[in-house]
Amino acid sequence: MHSSALLCYLVFLAGVGASRDRGTQSENSCTHFPTSLPHMLHELRAAFSRVKTFFQMKDQLDNMLLNGSLLEDFKGYLGCQALSEMIQFYLEEVMPQAENHGPDIKEHVNSLGEKLKTLRVRLRRCHRFLPCENKSKAVEQVKSAFSKLQEKGVYKAMSEFDIFINYIEAYMTTKMKN
């Protein structure tokens, strides 16, 4: 009986130690996040470069989907929410449609989506960068314009993904200065 109690106690202590290590890892990853951000943005840009030409050639529209009002939201007090909503918009609405353009495109868009998900996880883990609740009107305008473009919306949104990366960079630069 004593040996089973001792075993349970040792398992408990091991669990406590492991959870402490995870907490330290999470804190360390947040400490190093500002220095790893340029690398993450570089990876996003590299992944996008594999599909950029395809989607920009298909985008025959002159108007911009991602405009200055969205950038202003990214730089202002709604930056957190705008970033969060735009990541969700690309992951849930744009990229699933973008994947429907052949196996090569699907593979590259999927890779791009995974990198964007990784960024989102890191941002959420470090509450300093994504502590938000309010809605962004600029994001709602982007979503509305995207819907109105119907099948052309995916070309427009994907062709402007590099602008989105630039907006992420602008938001993160602002947050790191604060």
Curated annotation (Swiss-Prot):
Pfam families: IL10 (PF00726)
SUPFAM superfamilies in the cross-refs: 4-helical cytokines (SSF47266)
Entry keyword set: Cytokine, Disulfide bond, Glycoprotein, Secreted, Signal
Highest taxon of source: Eukaryota
Signal sequence residues: 1-18
Entry-listed glycosylation sites: N67, N134
Classification via SMART domains: IL10
GO biological process: immune response; interleukin-10-mediated signaling pathway; negative regulation of B cell proliferation; negative regulation of cytokine production involved in immune response; negative regulation of inflammatory response; negative regulation of interleukin-6 production; negative regulation of membrane protein ectodomain proteolysis; positive regulation of B cell apoptotic process
Disulfide partners: C30-C126, C80-C132
InterPro entries in the cross-refs: 4_helix_cytokine-like_core (IPR009079), IL-10 (IPR000098), IL-10/19/20/24/26 (IPR020443), IL-10_CS (IPR020423)
UniProt keyword annotation of Flavoprotein present: no
UniProt subcellular location: Secreted
Record GO cellular component, one term: extracellular space
GO molecular function terms noted in the UniProt entry: cytokine activity
Family: Belongs to the IL-10 family.
Oligomeric form and interacting partners: Homodimer. Interacts with IL10RA and IL10RB.
Protein task: Major immune regulatory cytokine that acts on many cells of the immune system where it has profound anti-inflammatory functions, limiting excessive tissue disruption caused by inflammation. Mechanistically, IL10 binds to its heterotetrameric receptor comprising IL10RA and IL10RB leading to JAK1 and STAT2-mediated phosphorylation of STAT3. In turn, STAT3 translocates to the nucleus where it drives expression of anti-inflammatory mediators.
Name of the protein in question: Interleukin-10
Taxonomic placement: Eukaryota, Metazoa, Chordata, Craniata, Vertebrata
